[in-house]
Each structure stands twice: as C-alpha cells, then as structure tokens.
From Swiss-Prot:
Protein's UniProt name: Methylthioribose-1-phosphate isomerase
Gene Ontology biological-process entries: L-methionine salvage from methylthioadenosine
Record: active site: D251
Single GO cellular component term: cytoplasm
GO molecular function, one term: S-methyl-5-thioribose-1-phosphate isomerase activity
Induction per the UniProt record: By iron deficiency in roots.
Pathway: Amino-acid biosynthesis; L-methionine biosynthesis via salvage pathway; L-methionine from S-methyl-5-thio-alpha-D-ribose 1-phosphate: step 1/6
Gene3D superfamilies: translation initiation factor eif-2b, domain 1, Translation initiation factor eif-2b, domain 2
Family: Belongs to the eIF-2B alpha/beta/delta subunits family. MtnA subfamily.
InterPro entries noted in UniProt: IF-2B-related (IPR000649), IF-M1Pi (IPR005251), IF_2B-like_C (IPR042529), Initiation_fac_2B_a/b/d (IPR011559), M1Pi_N (IPR027363), NagB/RpiA_transferase-like (IPR037171)
Length: 374
C-alpha cells in the first residue's frame, strides 16, 4: 500500500519506480513496482497510469530504472544507444494518441545518439539517459505550476472579474495525470489558492470515470469547493449560467489548434459555444505537434469494448446486452474554432483579431522554443 499524501501518481528514486494504480481509486490506494520498460508498457496500456504528461514521464522513468540495472552490459556506446532507442519505440506503442510520449522519446533518442558519438563507455550513454529522464520529472511540476498561474491570471482578465469564478472540467488533468499539480486542474488549483474560485464542476467522464474517480478525489483532497455532474448534464449546467468557463487538458494539439482530448470534450466545446461559455485548453508545449496541420491527422486510440459492456470502466460486472457491438474511441478532436485560448507554461496562445485563428508556430518562435520542437 502506498501513502497518498501529496497525491503522487509517480514515486521515483534512482533505480526504483512505483506507480499509483489509478484503476483502484478512490477506494483503494495501491502502488505497483515498475522494474523495466515492459512493466512500464503494461502499466500505461492497462491505465494504471494515465494522462498525457504522466505516461510520458512514467515511460521515460521505467526505462531509466531498467538501464540503471545494466551493470553487466558489454556492448559499445553505439549499441547502448540502439538499445535505448528500440526500448523507447516500444514504449511509444503503448498509447499512440498522446504526443507527449512520442515527443519525449524523440528527444531522448536524440540525446543518446549524440552522446554515443563522443563517449567511449556504454555506461555513459545510460547515465546520460537517466539524467535526462529525471530532469523531465522535475520540469513537469514547474511547468504545470506555470500553466496554472498563466491560466488563472488570464481567466481573471478575460472574464473581467476578481472573484467568484466557477468552471467545469473534464476527465482528470491534475496531480494524478502529471508529475504533480496538473494542467487544467492546475489552473483550478491556482484559481482556488488565489481566492477567486467559487466552485469547480467536474464530469464523470465515462466510460472509465476519470472524473468521478480521480478528479473528484483530488478536489476533495485539496478541499476545493466542487460538484460532480453526469456527462449528460453539462449542457444544462451551462444553460443555467452557473459557470463562466470550461477548462480541459489535451493529449495532442495540431498546428492549427485542433485538440485531441478525452472523449466527450468535443461535446462540451459545442455546448459551450452555443451557451456563450468560454472554452480553454490547458497543456504543456510538449502536447503541441507542429507536424500535423490539423486534427484530421491525429490517430485516435480505440479502447476495449469491455469498458462499455461492463461496469467500473470494464472492471466490473456486465451491464450491457450480450451480442451488442461497441464503438469506444478514447479521444475526440475539438476544432480550433470552438477553443477560446490555449494555456501553456510559456503563456496563453490567443487567436489573431484579423481572422480568429491560432498561429501556434509564431507563438513558439516568439518563446524561442521552435528549434527544440523540430
């Protein structure tokens, strides 16, 4: 059993990785040991750990634990780099929609390849990899706090209020979906700590219930005033005038701002547009994929039919008629024209006044980040 304390989904010390089994929350707090990339792949695919930032870090650290134990490795530096690269490629296959995982793998592959060109000892390749993976863990928390700060200040200005802001969020984007603090939920935390949040509403987020099981759990833990609603109640909530904004996370953002996120996000965006409610995406720069012109190119993962056929997101008893077919996409794509702004750790990406479109590439260039994303 693990100690929840600060709501850590990832507990890492060099050579050791434990992941909070989020499938058992909120009724049971249990950590599993991850000793190699295979353990990491299974944990990600089986939803032990989820959330785009968290799975990228969990994958990187799973391999860090594995290579830390390769004291008897006798290959060359080039062979060590190939070993790491192949393991990273394998880990990326665990959940293909989230760009954070593939982005982290690309950067780490590049690092070990460059290191292999100058080092004479294979162990130096592994050490460079471990150091880089550990840096990703530390950076994620600071990036999330920056997202929260930028988002809270922007909402305050955009809504032209200094208190009593109520928002709706979807899925889980907090400490359980990241290395700590959270993205969309990080904005909510910042609003709360700043004394300007009246209430946070969260959806169930069926069929895996990340909202009712995880987000509600985090909000109660942090003593944030919050209310859980059924997914199907969101439009009625917006019509009631009880919320001023919707804030969601992202698994992948295309160059034009189209955003892939948990299934049901598109529904919320359409409802928000109809009811005049502002709709925000909060995500790190690593969630942006400039190689994709639009959301049409985003690969959407399909989950097991059991998540719909059985209760508890597929883990419980059968609730649907035997023989019924199932379509169970894990994500949908929200068009950029439904999104008010995109909140990142480097600031808020807004639309141009001229044509109401995002110019994400220019934003990244102005933040001096573009060269690192090629």
């Amino acid at each position: 059993m693990g100690e929840l304390g600060a709501l850590q989904s990832i507990v890492y010390h060099r050579g050791s990785l434990r992941l909070l089994d989020q499938r058992k929350l909120p009724l049971e707090v249990d950590y599993i040991d991850v000793k190699c990339s295979g353990d990491g792949w299974n944990a990600i695919r089986d939803m032990v750990v989820r959330g785009a930032p968290a799975i990228a870090i969990a994958a990187a650290l799973a391999l860090a634990v594995e290579v830390s134990g390769l004291e008897d490795f006798t290959g060359t530096p080039a062979e060590a780099a190939v070993f790491v690269s192949e393991k990273l490629e394998y880990l990326v296959s665990s959940r293909p929609t989230a760009v954070n995982l593939s982005d982290a793998a690309t950067k780490l592959r590049s690092l070990v390849s460059r290191t292999a060109e100058t080092e004479k000892d294979a162990k130096a390749i592994f050490q460079a990899y471990i150091d880089a993976a550990e840096t990703m863990l530390v950076d994620d928390v600071s990036d999330n706090k920056a997202i929260g700060s930028h988002g809270a200040e922007f909402l305050k200005q955009k809504l032209e209020v200094s208190k009593d802001i109520s928002v709706l969020t979807h899925c889980n984007t907090g400490s359980l979906a990241t290395a700590g603090y959270g993205t969309a939920l990080g904005v909510i935390r910042a609003l709360h700590s700043g004394g300007i949040l009246e209430k946070a509403f969260c959806t169930e987020t069926r069929p895996f219930n990340q909202g009712s099981r995880l987000t509600a759990f985090e909000l109660v833990h942090d003593k944030v005033p919050a209310t859980l609603i059924a997914d199907s109640a969101a439009a009625a909530l917006m019509k009631s005038g009880c919320i001023q904004a919707v804030i969601v996370g992202a698994d992948r953002i295309a160059a034009n701002g189209d955003t892939a996120n948990k299934i049901g996000t598109y529904n919320l965006a359409i409802s928000a547009k109809h009811h005049g409610v502002q709709f925000y995406v909060a995500a790190p720069i690593t969630s942006i994929d400039l190689s994709l012109p639009s959301g049409e190119q985003i690969v959407i993962e399909e989950r097991s039919p059991n998540e719909l056929l059985n209760s508890e997101g597929g883990l419980g008893k059968q609730v649907a008629a035997s023989g019924i077919s199932v379509w169970n996409p894990a994500f949908d794509v929200t068009p950029a024209n439904l999104i008010t702004a995109i909140i990142t750790e480097k600031g808020v990406i807004t639309k141009s006044d001229a044509d109401e479109t995002f110019n994400i590439k220019d934003f990244i260039q102005s933040a001096k980040l573009y060269s690192t994303m090629q």
